[in-house]
Amino acid sequence: MGDDDTPVCLSVASCKGVSCWLDKLLLWALTLSITLRNTAVDCRRVDRNGLLSPNLNSSMSVVRMGQNVSLSCSSKNTSIDITYSLFLGKRYLESKRRRGGAVDFHLRISNANESGPYKCKVNDSNSSKYSQNFNFTIIQDESCSSCLLSLLLPGVLLGLILPGLAFLIYLKYKKGCTGKTLKENESKGSGDAPTQGELYANICETQKGSEQLQEIHYTTPVFKEVAPTEQEGLEDRKDDYIYSELTY
């Protein structure tokens, strides 16, 4: 009977050994899990108490020269007062302070050097963090010819309009002068006899030996028709005459 009990005792002993080994392994795994959990909690606690890196972005990344832009620097730390500072490369631009959230910086792109890189810095009394770099893309005007045309067009139109106006004024003035001359000629003339004023010069010579200069007098004769008169002794002659009265 003893021979029959020996294998049973050995199997029970081996089962106890395996069970102890499994218990030790389970205990070690449980300890490791608790340790890792505590480490994670400590890391989270450090992140909550420390600063997080801010985020810098803009509503537009492609701009033109001379355009106004805005950069937004945001932080997830909302429980403490934070100072936000903006940098262009290593050059300091501006600072704002508030309790977490986001702040906006307004800029004007005046030259190609102001395209970037921009960087935002957040800091409190204990630490500071920087954001990623941000760059703008500056595009040139599509065509300079259109700008040139818009500048030259007013000058070209002005150059065309002014000569046209001058020509119209000249024609109007010439027409007015011609009409006035015709009216004067019609008022001077009468009947079918063409009478036009001519310029005559009367030269009066001084007496010999006098030192006075010669004077030239100009006058315009006016011709008028008068009725013919009958002369005595010439009744038989039927010649027609036209008489004019000369007035100075």
Curated annotation (Swiss-Prot):
Task: Identify the domain of life.
Answer: Eukaryota
Q: Which cysteines in this chain are paired by disulphide bridges? A: 73-120
The record's Gene Ontology cellular component field reads: plasma membrane
The record's section on Pfam families has: Ig_2
Provide the protein's localization.
Cell membrane
Position of the signal peptide: 1-33
- Entry-listed glycosylation sites: 68, 135
Induction section of the entry = Up-regulated in response to mast cell activation.
Which terms under GO biological process does the entry name?
mast cell degranulation; negative regulation of mast cell activation
Kindly give the InterPro entries that the UniProt entry links to this protein.
Ig-like_dom, Ig-like_dom_sf, Ig-like_fold, Ig_sub
Which positions bear Phosphotyrosine?
218, 243
| UniProt domain Ig-like C2-type: residue ranges | 54-137
Modifications the protein undergoes after translation, according to the UniProt entry:
N-glycosylated.
Note the topology in the membrane. Single-pass type I membrane protein
Residue ranges of the TM segments: 151-171
Q: In which tissues is it expressed?
A: Mast cell-specific. Expressed in primary and transformed mast cells.
Positions in the Extracellular compartment: 34-150
Keyword annotations of the record = Cell membrane, Disulfide bond, Glycoprotein, Immunoglobulin domain, Membrane, Phosphoprotein, Signal, Transmembrane, Transmembrane helix
Supply the name of the protein.
Allergin-1
Task: Tell me what organism the protein belongs to.
Answer: Rattus norvegicus
